[in-house]
Amino acid sequence: MCSSDLIRFDQAFSNETGLSLFESSQLALARWSVDNQLVERGDWSNDWDDWVNLIFSMRVQPKLGAKRPVLVTHFPASQAALAKLAADDERTAERYELFYHGVELANGYHELLNPSELANRAQIANRQRIEDGKFPLPIENPLFQAMKIGFPDCCGCALGFDRVVMLACQATSLREVIPFPADRA
């Protein structure tokens, strides 16, 4: 039987960077990224989450699950997507991802049930979309309507089967295991 490790997002981040995630400003993350040669200039983005994602994907993720699978929990609340905020730390969300050999194999979360919170998150996302030159998305979508009626408490997990196959076959890219990659479709 294979066991796995469990680590909070902020702890994994700190272990690899020495930075305290929730005490680091966008400017501090930008400086760290320049100093560690992830980007050439600190004006790559004005968004805290962009810097967190860059550092996580380039420095933290490649080292996750080196010996055995690891579940990364308590993602920043700003990256909650459709997850509930954690009752024990509202800076974080009840969201997790499973990594093995630096590859994300699965992700899941405890589903948000509050339609007001969903609308608030959609408004925040739409402001960012408009800033990025994209069209805003409708706030009162089918999920919002379902929450208003009464959505049952639930959670879910999505497994990237293609990624599991890639690791099992010791392939170096998904292209090697997907029968119809986009460029051959």
Predicted regions and their residues:
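Short, small-residue-biased leader/transition segments that mark boundaries at the very start
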Residues: 1-3
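A translation/RNA-centric and nucleic-acid-associated enzymatic feature enriched
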Residues: 7-185
